């Protein structure tokens, strides 16, 4: 009789647990002394086999009830829950477009990423073909939560990589335009979003703070010009015009766009030679003035 009443009390505990899982597991966890231990005296059983069987049966039911309580309890200490942020899925990743001229001697590498939201990019490849380019290879890789797509492209008429800086800028703007078209949520993270997107960027980059210009040695025949500044439509073409005004030749360019920031590299020369120190300083000053020109023009009046 004592054993039967013990089984009954556990069953009742399970029943009350189903109706009130939170309070039941709280009582069990916080106040274990309040739960009476069942009477398992061997004298209540006819033989040793019945005793062992009774204990195992009770133990099994107890374990099942505890597992059931852990699954259904909302404040169980054994199974803590970690609330997921409501806007985890609403965070818009940073769009990135990189045009690499050094990775492959035969082709221009275009790499773009937008978290894990990019698809097959069929329309982007079609748009590149409209520029007279051939996509000879495409690869997709994943690093953590970021999906990166790479295209190897060449000029259709020559079969060689793209060297013309104007065409490189067209490639960049074409890709960004497709991003804005098929992923309009990225508009507030791109400079072109202010003109062509559904929502202009909320955060404005201070041009004075963001602008860094350096000229480095890159052999006797050319120099490496590195520019980091706030991005804007047509930036590369305009910078090349500034260089042409001081008779600097642009041999090739690498163009990277990381959200609102442009990070560009140009291989430049003057009359077939690398830039000396004084000419490098003239170039840096001209570019710095051009990049700050909107504010300078206003202040000059």
UniProtKB/Swiss-Prot annotation:
InterPro entries: ACR1-12, ACT-like_dom_sf, ACT_dom. GO terms for cellular component: chloroplast; chloroplast stroma; chloroplast thylakoid membrane; plasma membrane. Its main location: plastid. The keyword Transit peptide applies. The keyword Plastid applies. Residues 1-57 form a transit peptide. It comes from the Eukaryota. PANTHER family: ACT DOMAIN-CONTAINING PROTEIN ACR12, ACT DOMAIN-CONTAINING PROTEIN ACR4-RELATED. May be involved in feedback regulation of amino acid metabolism. This is ACT domain-containing protein ACR12.
